[in-house]
C-alpha cells in the first residue's frame, strides 16, 4: 500500500513538472509568432532574454541556471557574427564546457533521484529489471522543476545520458502501470490512434495529453514521439504537432 502511494505520488510529480515544461514551450511558441517579423538573430536574442526573465522569477535560488542561460545567450550572439576560424573553435569549445557544467549541476540538483536513474540506466542496457518507483526516496517538486529547466538548457547531453531512445518494452511497462491507474480513459470514451497504428492491444488512452491541433493521445505515445522525431504529424488531421498539454477533461 505504501509503495503504491509512493509510486502514484512520484508519477504525479513527474506529470506536474511536465505540465510546467509543456506550458513554457507553448508560451515560447506563442512568443515566436509575436517576434516572427524580426531578424533571426534579433528574434533569438529576444527569446533568450525572455528565458532569463522566466528563470529569474521562478528559480531565483538557482543562480547557476541563470548564469548558464546568460553564457548561452552570449555564445548564440557570437555565433551569428563573422568570426575567424580560431575564434569559432573557441566558441564551440566554450559551448561544450557550459553544457558539461550544466549537466553536472543538473545531476547534483536531483536529490534522491540518482539511485533510480542508475537502476533505469541498467534496465535500458540489459532490459532485465525495471526499477520500482516506490522503492526510492521521494522527490520534491523543486528538484523536478530544476531538472526540467536544466534539460531544456543542455538537451543534447541529457538525451545521450538518459538514452532517449528508450526501448519499446519500457513504454509497455509504463502503459501497464497507467492502465491500472485512475488516469485511464475507458475504451468507449477515447482511443489513442498512435496505439492503434502501432498495433497495441491497449488502445484506451492512458494519461491523456492533447496536442496543439486538438487531438488527444497517451502521454507515453505523444511525448516519446516529440522527443525522438523532428516533425511529428498528427495521425488524425496530419497537422504538425508542436507541443502537447495534459487534458484535464478526459483525466
Swiss-Prot record:
Its main location: cytoplasm. Signal peptide: none annotated. It holds the Pfam family zf-RING_UBOX. A zinc finger (RING-type) spans 192-238. GO terms for biological process: ERAD pathway. It is found in: Cytoplasm. It comes from the Eukaryota. One of its GO terms (molecular function) is ubiquitin protein ligase activity. Keywords: Cytoplasm, Metal-binding, Zinc, Zinc-finger. GO terms for cellular component: cytoplasm. Coiled coil: none annotated. This is Uncharacterized RING finger protein C23A1.07. It comes from Schizosaccharomyces pombe (strain 972 / ATCC 24843).
